[in-house]
Curated annotation (Swiss-Prot):
Gene Ontology biological process terms from the UniProt entry: mRNA transport; viral process
Organism annotation: Human immunodeficiency virus type 1 group O (isolate MVP5180)
Subunit description: Homomultimer; when bound to the RRE. Multimeric assembly is essential for activity and may involve XPO1. Binds to human KPNB1, XPO1, TNPO1, RANBP5 and IPO7. Interacts with the viral Integrase. Interacts with human KHDRBS1. Interacts with human NAP1; this interaction decreases Rev multimerization and stimulates its activity. Interacts with human DEAD-box helicases DDX3 and DDX24; these interactions may serve for viral RNA export to the cytoplasm and packaging, respectively.
Region Homomultimerization: start-end pairs: 17-25
Gene3D superfamilies the record matches: 6.10.140.630
A matching Pfam family: REV
Motif (Nuclear export signal and binding to XPO1) on chain: 72-83
Main localisation: host cell
PTM summary: Asymmetrically arginine dimethylated at one site by host PRMT6. Methylation impairs the RNA-binding activity and export of viral RNA from the nucleus to the cytoplasm.
Region (Disordered): 24-49, 82-103
Keywords tagged on the record: AIDS, Host cytoplasm, Host nucleus, Host-virus interaction, Methylation, mRNA transport, Phosphoprotein, RNA-binding, Transport
Name of the featured protein: Protein Rev
Annotated Gene Ontology cellular component terms: host cell cytoplasm; host cell nucleolus
């Protein structure tokens, strides 16, 4: 066995990418108030779900080949990042349900 096959190389590269994804979302720190810890854990779980979804798609693409019926085209993996979309909002710019009335 002088070297690895191309399929093995692709699988190893996918595993390295998945490892980097998981390492980019460390567990939240236990510091702060109870509410702050709760919010950090909630945001972490949401990001972790995104990482799980991406990892599943990456691994499925490598193992089973690319699917032609993808509804969304993914950008190159080098451009993907994990961020909290709620952190980008300005305070007070949340969505308001017009069906509710203020009492």
């Amino acid at each position: 066995m002088a070297g690895r096959s191309e399929e093995d190389q692709q699988l190893l590269q996918a595993i390295q990418i998945i490892k980097i994804l998981y390492q980019s979302n460390p567990c939240p720190t236990p510091a702060g108030s109870r509410n702050a810890r709760k919010n950090r854990r909630r945001r972490w779980r949401r990001r972790q779900a995104q990482v799980d979804s991406l990892a599943t798609r990456i691994l499925a693409t490598v193992v089973h080949g690319s699917q032609d019926n993808n509804l969304v085209d993914l950008p190159p993996l080098e451009q993907l990042n994990i961020r909290d979309p709620e952190a980008d909002r300005l305070p007070g710019t949340g969505t308001v349900d017009p069906g509710t009335k203020d009492n």
